[in-house]
Amino acid sequence: MVTAALKRFWSGGHGEAGGEAGGATTVAVKPGLWTRLSTWAGALLRDYAEACGDAAAAARARPGRAALYVGLLGGAAACCALAPSEAAFEEALLDASGSLLLLAPATRNRHSEAFLQRLLWLRGRGRLRHVNLGFCSLVYEAPFDAQASLYQARCRYLQPRWVDFPGRILDVGFVGRWWILQNRMHDCDINDDEFLHLPAHLRVVAPHQLHSEANERLFEEKYKPIILTDDQVDQALWEEQVLQKERKDRLALSEADSLVQSDVSR
């Protein structure tokens, strides 16, 4: 549309110049600059109006395709607007680090802790890089600090190859979230090493076992009072008497040993 309007603008000027050269008796007045600009602007607006009219007619003819295109454009615009920045990654990293510090070392997930420690180590050495790709953002590992003046850091022939770039990606930011960091922090308070001493069938709990009737029954039974029979009460009393007698015997033996040692020292 813009090209057609420009052609009209310049062709009008050249046509008038040719008319002056062809006819000796005809006197043509060349329009001024503002007149030509107004003509060109009017032609441009008419072209845009025709294009908008054609687009509206096509949308009325095929509303499904038009809605799909509008949805795709709106989704692309939303992704570009919600692509997280480098400050958002710093905030998410510090938040995850604070959440992990609140847990006891024995209950921390080893994979979550190792991934977070690596990110913090790279951040402390200035080797984290952030790039915004429009629809999403990437955080990747750099071999050196951005301010390093070493020969290996400045020589372009020693830079990492592009084929190795996928292995250097640490996180992907999309629609306002850092997905790899969020995935690694899932169940960060569950340490699988704590359950290694259990039998194999007790290390993994199936989803249907979490709300089973057996679990519900055991949960209710733990609040019930313990009822002991007479035999159990007599057995408990007898065991208590035996324990008290053993304590008295040990105490008497310890006192006798102390007296013997004091006599020997004299």
From Swiss-Prot:
Transmembrane portions of the chain: 66-83
Subcellular location: Mitochondrion inner membrane
The organelle targeting sequence, given as a residue range: 1-37
GO molecular function, one term: protein transporter activity
InterPro entries, per database record: TIMM29
Coiled-coil ranges per UniProt: none
Residue numbers on the Mitochondrial matrix membrane side: 38-65
Ranges of the Mitochondrial intermembrane topological domain: 84-266
Topological relation to the membrane, as annotated: Single-pass membrane protein
GO BP: protein insertion into mitochondrial inner membrane
Predominant location category: mitochondrion
Pfam families hit by this protein: Tim29
Keyword annotations from UniProtKB, A to Z: Membrane, Mitochondrion, Mitochondrion inner membrane, Protein transport, Transit peptide, Translocation, Transmembrane, Transmembrane helix, Transport
Cited function: Component of the TIM22 complex, a complex that mediates the import and insertion of multi-pass transmembrane proteins into the mitochondrial inner membrane. The TIM22 complex forms a twin-pore translocase that uses the membrane potential as the external driving force. Required for the stability of the TIM22 complex and functions in the assembly of the TIMM22 protein into the TIM22 complex. May facilitate cooperation between TIM22 and TOM complexes by interacting with TOMM40.
Oligomer and partners: Component of the TIM22 complex, which core is composed of TIMM22, associated with TIMM10 (TIMM10A and/or TIMM10B), TIMM9, AGK and TIMM29. Interacts with TIMM10B; the interaction is direct. Interacts with TOMM40; linking the TIM22 complex to the TOM complex. Interacts with TIMM22 (when oxidized); the interaction is direct.
Protein name: Mitochondrial import inner membrane translocase subunit Tim29
Lineage summary: Eukaryota, Metazoa, Chordata, Craniata, Vertebrata
